[in-house]
A protein has these predicted regions:
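Class I S-adenosyl-L-methionine-dependent methyltransferase catalytic core
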Residues: 1-190
Length: 190
């Protein structure tokens, strides 16, 4: 008989996980996922990463010549400490983030509110972020421009612990552009 963990993963029922969540929702981004984003999205020179964790996103951006303002609510040894949600300073350039899961909507909404016109916000999120009546006002206020879905699963690691293996979660890059008013375009990352 298959284990409970195996069955849930096969059903893609990640919301039924019996794993303990990381206290501050730190799930690091695979650097390859950021490389993939940069193949499709032309970012401005200056990029803010407001949930930098251990620097996986920022390091890829730096290696591509971007000037990166990287910070996090929790000091994880990279960037500096700052509370993104309580800072209303207008952002110069673009934002790239893998925000704490439980505050995803708040991070996207706040980021869009402090971006300059034409600035992009790229958020590494679950595909299921599209669902929910609760997020409808966010998508109404800030129409999504692009959604880049990974054809092959990419991972987000609790506390950057890669020994925990993969998951059945489907992630993608959501890309908003301040001032965009059209319909979203879905593209795939091979």
């Amino acid at each position: 008989m298959a284990s409970k963990d195996y069955i849930f993963k096969m059903m893609a029922a990640s919301s039924h996980s019996s794993d303990v969540r990381e206290e501050h929702d730190f799930y690091s981004t695979e650097p390859k996922a950021v490389e993939d984003l940069l193949r499709y999205v032309d970012l401005q020179h200056k990029v803010t990463e407001p949930s930098c964790g251990n620097g996986n996103i920022a390091n890829v951006l730096l290696s591509h010549g971007h000037e990166v303002d990287a910070y996090d609510l929790i000091d994880r040894g990279f960037g500096y400490t700052k509370d993104f949600l309580s800072d209303n300073t207008q952002i110069e350039g673009d934002i790239v983030m893998n925000r704490p899961y439980k505050y995803a909507m708040e991070h996207v909404s706040h980021g869009m509110s402090i971006l300059k016109e034409g600035g992009k916000l790229c958020a590494f999120l679950k595909v299921q972020f599209l669902e929910s009546q609760k997020r409808k006002p966010l998508f109404d206020a800030y129409p999504l421009k692009y959604m880049y879905v990974f054809r092959k699963r990419t991972n987000s690691y609790r506390n950057d612990d890669r020994s925990l293996g993969g998951s059945a979660v489907c992630y993608c890059w959501y890309v908003w552009e301040k001032g965009y008013t059209g319909e979203p375009t879905i593209r795939w990352i091979d």
